[in-house]
Amino acid sequence: MNLSLAKNYFGRVFDLFKIKLPGQMGIDKDIKQAKFRNNQNKAMVNIMFTHAWMVDHIKSFVKSENITPQQYNILRILRGAGEPLSTLQLRERMLDKMSDTSRIVERMVSKGLVQKAVSEKDKRMVDVILTPQGAELLENLDRRNEELDAVVNHLSDEELETLNSLLDKLRNNH
């Protein structure tokens, strides 16, 4: 299949992922690697590179509030849940499953962003509760959400839906 047929067949996916046709910048130029083992390898490298790029943006975004991306994630999870959650429940919902949730929560307690209390549902468990200070920090970041949104603002709603569908499909295949 030639490139023009492929572009017609895959439609906006080429544009969505900024797939570069000959003569344009792409992952190969970004990391100065001329050849990849195959398209699957190139896609994996591109996803890893994009992940690192996104993490850098998020680190920069939360730095002003003196928190880490993992702490931001926990604050968002607690606010979204609307109720206290155990550290196990937090770990299950976190974006970074390898995080040491207990240690992160302890740091957040020392900053006054969350509190820990014995669970009312199960006295053997400890619940993590969002404090007013933690909620205020989230509100400060909410007012600046357009900084994060700017990363994908150049994509149309259709492209964002396609991107989300493809990323979901990638994860759900395994």
Q: Predicted segment positions?
A:
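Charged, amphipathic alpha-helical coiled-coil/dimerization segments
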Residues: 106-164
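Inter-domain helical "communication" segments and dimerization helices
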Residues: 21-26, 36, 40, 139, ...
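N-terminal helix-turn-helix DNA-binding core of bacterial DNA-binding proteins
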Residues: 52, 56-97
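N-terminal leader segment of winged-helix/HTH proteins
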Residues: 1-65
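Exposed, interaction-prone assembly regions rather than primary DNA-binding/catalytic cores
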Residues: 161-174
